[in-house]
Amino acid sequence: MFCVQCEQTIRTPVGNGCSYAQGMCGKTAETSDLQDLLVAVLQGLSAWALTARELGIVDHEIDSFAPRAFFSTLTNVNFDSDRIVGYAKEAILLRQSLAIRCRLIDSTITVDHPLAELQLDSDDIPTLQQQAQQFTLNNDKAEVGDDIHGLRMLCLYGLKGAAAYMEHAYVLGQFDEQIYAQYHAYMAWLGTQPRDVDTLLNNAMGIGKMNFNVMAILDRGETQAYGDPQPTSVNVRPVAGKAILISGHDLKDLQMLLEQTQGTGINIYTHGEMLPAHGYPELKRYSHLVGNYGSGWQNQQIEFAKFPGPILMTSNCIIDPNVGNYGDRIWTRSIVGWPGVNHLEGEDFTPVIEQALGMAGFPYNELEHLITVGFGRQTLLNAADTVIDLVATKKLRHVFLVGGCDGSRTERSYFTDFARSVPQDCIIMTLACGKYRFNKLDFGTLEGLPRLLDVGQCNDAYSAIMLAVKLSEKLGCTVNDLPLSLVLSWFEQKAIVILLTLLSLGVKNIYTGPTAPGFLTDNLMAILYEKFGMRPITTVEQDMKAILGH
């Protein structure tokens, strides 16, 4: 086992990465190794998809399957070894079928790629785990060096984050053949074990640019299906009644659950990255979408244990449900998996609903506590002139984007303290689950504008980018000349690709924390600082002084 993809990876003086019987996330060595094998199979599949395109063959099933299967290897998504193997088997069947179609056009066709003909050695998991040792991500690290290895991981993990957003978009009926072609090109290239520093850096930026287009179609899918988010008050305290909790990012799953629970007397609560759903007109019209429950994903073992109903996980992040003894009432969907828990294959939530009806639910209404969400792309763009006027009249000094992933590391209190320290003549935009560090605090208003603007999920960084672009156009300057600073927390691969997207667009002077990614060496961090001014957080006082000048 070797895995260094998330922020909580083991760090030692001799190297970083989880490499023992179990990762810090709870992923076993078996599952980790099988995920490496799956990635190798998917890289071979992408090599064939590229060759097929040269022959005029575009296989939409492969285009949708490949990023979905890759998504299953993201941090805190799928811990079920059998299902990981199932994805690998399906990938090989799809590859073989595509090869037959290619050879009907050109019987001599071959694919010059080391993984193009990769087969599984067995159906037996121990044998497959042994085979997977060939594809452990640090196999040639001693040969190529830490910097090359780190750049490979930057590209691989960035592409993994983009694959997740591609799947979210596809679920909403949004896809783009050019994006799929780019995805396959990067995936196949990574399977060749690239060693050139400049190519690795350039392709990392290319993955970031590709992801900007992915976020654009995802934004389109969400707003076409559910309307543009509107500022909306959300109760974060329970109300009396039977309950289902839904977590993850998949708004379509939430919509289907709301439809299927209408008239049942069951209240639906969002958790984690589902919070922004309350701002979408076509979702908030359901009266039994009553509020948001809990905080950051890392607290779920305590919070889920106290929730008096079933829990539906639609994407990341899931952690061991046995710790809180709620494994019998957590349900997984799509690419999510945990061994021994209930998995829903289709779109019928009847088993979840029946379980909720058989449970007590919340016994009484707690005192209401409202927070505001729904400052999506259109709302932000509509406010652009107001922001410009406030800046021009010196009533608004600076805008901070403080957000990203949450996690359990104690150093993450920095982001709470930073938000608290933002001066009264400044506003804060936030997004992703990092907002839970401070989104229940009262920041008041500035000239009628809320000082805390919840932009949405992690992919809604697109909304913040579009606001920055519009402001820069109106003011006749670059994005980097705006009174805007980004202070981002990271945990997993979606955050990595959003960072690559920002860097690829030329956004500079980003502060990141709580720690640098374990795969980025000091040399690589120095390169990112030199090229983009990207820097690790230090102390709130020091960073605030550096940003505001005093």
Curated annotation (Swiss-Prot):
**What is one Gene Ontology biological process annotated in the Swiss-Prot or TrEMBL record?**
response to hydrogen peroxide
Any one annotated GO CC term: cytoplasm
Q: Can you tell me which residues bind hybrid [4Fe-2O-2S] cluster? A: H249, E273, C317, C405, C433, C458, E492, K494
Q: Where in the cell is it found?
A: Cytoplasm
Provide the cofactor note recorded for this chain's UniProt entry.
Binds 1 [2Fe-2S] cluster.
Please indicate which superkingdom the organism of origin belongs to: Bacteria
- Which cofactors, if any, are listed as required? [2Fe-2S] cluster; hybrid [4Fe-2O-2S] cluster
Gene3D superfamilies (alphabetical):
1.20.1270.20, 3.40.50.2030
Which keywords does the record carry?
A: 2Fe-2S, Cytoplasm, Iron, Iron-sulfur, Metal-binding, Oxidoreductase
- Is Cytoplasm given among the entry's keywords? yes
Q: Where does the chain bind [2Fe-2S] cluster? A: C3, C6, C18, C25
The chain residues annotated with the modification Cysteine persulfide are: C405
A GO MF annotation of the entry reads: 2 iron, 2 sulfur cluster binding
Q: Tell me the Pfam families matching this sequence.
A: Prismane
**Which reaction is the catalytic activity of this chain?**
A + NH4(+) + H2O = hydroxylamine + AH2 + H(+)
InterPro entries per the record? Answer: HCP/CODH, Hydroxylam_reduct, Prismane-like_a/b-sand, Prismane-like_sf, Prismane_a-bundle
- What EC number(s) has UniProt assigned to this enzyme? 1.7.99.1
Job of this protein? Catalyzes the reduction of hydroxylamine to form NH(3) and H(2)O.
Similarity-based family: Belongs to the HCP family.
What is the official name of this protein in its record?
Answer: Hydroxylamine reductase
**Source species of the chain:** Yersinia enterocolitica serotype O:8 / biotype 1B (strain NCTC 13174 / 8081)
